[in-house]
């Protein structure tokens, strides 16, 4: 459906001169991200584990690589796309790559949870060094069929023509998500 929408926009732009731009937005996250998305699952679970309201988080592919940006940056890019002198197609991304496991490690560090990773593959686990409990494990049922292992965007065109670049780093995004989640329990 995304590909169809893209080509429909291009068709109407070219055929009828409609101001129709496409924004190809790589993964963009915020504290309000839905609970079925991996970043939200990770943040929510680690905050709950820290507060002793949850024991373990079960995930799929820890080695999927994503280009995660902050939704605030992406909203700004959308506005800039609409202000540009002519319609065009744009890639909005951070040009940064991070594995799911790296995202977990950053979140854990922010929450002062020291993880010890053990084993490889489907048996890989993370143990909280303080409590000695397994708090992250893997289950095949969370591996998505047809999942793309590597997603990284190049926003150089937007940088050059729109003068847009992301302001928020991954640590800022993680901090915002964690603070939002912690506030729900205070």
PLM feature segments, named:
Residues 21-24, 92:
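Short glycine/serine/threonine-enriched helix-capping/active-site loop
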Residues 1-21, 43-51:
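Active-site Tyr-X1-5-Lys
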Residues 26-29:
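Proline-glycine-enriched beta-turn/loop adjacent to the NAD(P) cofactor-binding site
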Residues 33-186:
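C-terminal substrate-binding subdomain of Rossmann-fold SDR/epimerase-dehydratase oxidoreductases
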